[in-house]
Amino acid sequence: MEEEFRTIMLNTSAISEVVGNRISFNSATQGAALPYIVLHVIDDQEEHTYQGPDGLSQGRVQVDCYGATYGQAKTLSRHVRGALDGYRGGQFSAIFHASTRDNREGGTNEPERPFTVQLDFLTKWRT
């Protein structure tokens, strides 16, 4: 699931033209140039019938869009939402936008702290 989720964004020109291949899971590559995207699997639950697993899973993926400015992070988040919300294809039967949060990274050097827009997506896919 993770690879295909990332590939959807890499294959969306509005996203890849901004971040290139700087889309990773769990943490950004150290020293990565802004803007970039970090993905987190928040939960992943295999669905069952009384006979056992039914071959479908549902979960939630958090997409963190980082930018040097709020505008850069927000614009990137809009491209991500446009690419993923309502997506159906490949092993995904559905991806839906669930929530958005605007944030700014903590740290001691305020001018260097990136801006972040976090989006949560509910996913349903065939395992």
Q: How should each PLM-predicted stretch be described?
A:
Residues 42, 66-68, 122-126:
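Solvent-exposed residues in well-ordered beta-strands and their adjoining turns
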Residues 1-53, 71, 75, 82, ...:
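Small/polar-rich, solvent-exposed N-terminal microdomains that initiate assembly or binding
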Residues 58-66:
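Active-site-adjacent structural patch at catalytic or cofactor/ligand-binding sites
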Residues 31-33, 53-57, 111-116:
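A generic structural micro-feature
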Residues 82-127:
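Acidic-leaning, charged glycine-interspersed low-complexity segments
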Residues 37, 61, 119:
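A broad, low-specificity signal marking well-ordered, structured residues that form hydrophobic/aromatic
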Residues 58, 71-79, 98-101:
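Low-complexity, flexible helical/coil segments
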